[in-house]
Amino acid sequence: LAALASAPALAAGRAWQPAGFVALGDWGRRGDPVQSAVARGLAAGAREVASRFVIAAGDNFYPGGVASIRDPHWKDSFEAVYVDPGLQTPWYAALGNHDYRGAPQAQVAYTGHSRRWRMPGRYYKASGAVCGVPDLDLFVIDTSPLVDDLNLDERVQQLCRGHWWQAEAEPEIAWLRDALARSRAPWKIVVGHHPIYSGAHGDSPVLIARVAPLLEAFGVQAYIHGHDHDLQHIRRGSVDYICSGAGSQGGRVRAIPGTRFCLGQPGFAAFRLRPEVLQLQLRGAAGEVLYSAALPRTR
């Protein structure tokens, strides 16, 4: 934790160029009307913020993931839906619980067969040099092995496919701690499928105990997730928790302690990163801005 004594300085000697990106979760429904509508709004939002990449926050393929890299789901839910030129950028994807009902490794493998799909592992880091935003490090984690021992349905789904969450969780937590400790980026964002704090499915005690302290300790500014089929902005401590899980469906949501905004309708999140502020917009299916907030780099 000694590395946290002072925040890293912003890259010097160059003019800052505002960097945009967009995020959506819970989206892959073979191009159904709601998914397609949100895809059009996402494209408009991506153009407006000059998006450099897309965050896909899990549950990428409903209802049971993909079976292989040749599964028709890839075309029906991804390649043939997000066709706008503004979305032909890297997609940094996380795994969700529905993805584990198929072959999650196929989503990792698809990275080698796609010009834009990025999932080099179940959890990984995309540095600023990789994602095209020099002052940002992006950390994508796989939350299902961390939380699904508390959910009987998901536990059975995973056990039937040989996923032993206890064995998979410890190395991931150790990796996240080490990766955050090593990061010198002024901006750090962590992406996972499941919420840590939630006004829909409810808080995750495991993630509160094991992930939230790492976010606080290592100066992470934001945690972006899906799972809840809604749009939320919650601030707890020094971290902003942003739900963008409404890529193909809306759902019920309520305000909880720390809630700045919540709405249970389809949509997505758009961001514009500046040296000291991350501008957040939660947008509806048509791309309209429903809520905006300026998230400071230091709290």
Predicted regions and their residues:
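Residue-level marker for buried hydrophobic side chains located in beta-strands
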Residues: 21-23, 54-56, 93, 190, ...
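A short C-terminal boundary segment appended to hydrolase-like catalytic domains
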Residues: 260-261, 266-299
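Membrane-interface helix/loop caps of multi-pass membrane proteins
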Residues: 51, 57, 95-97, 136, ...
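Extended active-site neighborhood of metal-dependent phosphoesterases/phosphodiesterases
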Residues: 62-187, 207-222, 228-274
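N-terminal export signals
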Residues: 1-12
